[in-house]
Amino acid sequence: MTDKRYPVNKSTKKRSKLKILKWFLILFVLTNIILMFYYDQKVDMFDVKKVAAKRADMHGHNIVTGFTTTVTLLEVADKLINKPGGYLTNDKLPPSAFMDNIPNWEYGVLVQVRDLARVIRNDFSRSQSQSLEDEDLKIADPRFHYENNHWIFPRTESQYSEGIEAMHNYLERLSDNNQEDAQFYARTDNLVSWLNLVEKRLGGLSQKLSASVEKERLNTDLSGDTAATQSTYKPSELKVKTSWFKIDDNFYEARGSTYALIHFLKAIEVDFAQVLEKKNALISLRQIIRELEATQESIWTPMILNGSGFGLFANHSLVMASYISRANAGIIDLRQLLENG
């Protein structure tokens, strides 16, 4: 019961509540800032051979043809959803909701995971077009193609986890010498199928990154075929310029895509070693990997700079586009060498 001789000052109570609210907001902001720095950590590269050997030792697997590629896919997919902060693309609460660099990095990784998972299902695991597809890969592939920003019922992470589990089941059977129905065929035509996808992905990324500076481009959509037509008319000259708000999105998507691709190419070097050696293409592949590794260098500015081509400030997008374009040229040469060499 309040003592009437000492009435409570309403303004004092109000100030006390405001003080508590102020400290709560300060704590909330500081916590989110700390979490943002934690979530924004660079995901480490890993040695595909060591990871494959470690998994083989842990689970008693035999390192057979295709083992390293499959393990590398599993490792990259695991890092996608279990890195510091987990999978952020579908988060609706702070601080993840205010961060777009990591979700774009995740999307870049995801595209490469999807492409490789589909090629393993349709090409690497099948001897010819009339052969049966693997039952576990039939589950894994569509799981990885589930929409990347679904929050609940079901969550995106749960679908990708099911894809990882199905791919792991395929790996278990692949490494078992008594399981003849799980196969991985390291053939030239299979590798060419995947390289065709890779060169399209890298070409698209290079175009988006190069558009950070406004340019006039000639429309080459129908070049090389005098009888070619297209559904919708486009002018012969185009002005292309990436929105300022999309500059860092494209950059981090490319960084994520190349992160995954570096590891996949290193795994391909192991599993397709005989094919590459026969075509004298190992050095070409290693040079492509070296070009892509340059895309993972540390960024020493707090934001992605977008200076003009020969201006005072750097243009991170053009630098990234340069590395990717050189790697893509190498991919095209490698594919042609495998097809015709």
Predicted feature locations:
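N-terminal Lys/Arg-rich, disordered targeting/topogenic segments
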Residues: M1-S16
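Hydrophobic single-pass membrane-insertion segments
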Residues: M36-V48
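A cross-kingdom marker for long, charged
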Residues: V48-A53, D57, D249-Y252, T258-G341
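N-terminal Sec/ER secretory leader and immediately downstream segment
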Residues: K50-Q159
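A cross-kingdom feature marking solvent-exposed beta-strand/loop segments within repeated
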Residues: D91-N101, E147-P154, L238-D248, T301-V319
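Long, amphipathic, charge-rich alpha-helical segments that form helical bundles/coiled-coils
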Residues: D136-L174, S284-G309
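Extended amphipathic alpha-helical interaction segments
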Residues: Y160-I289
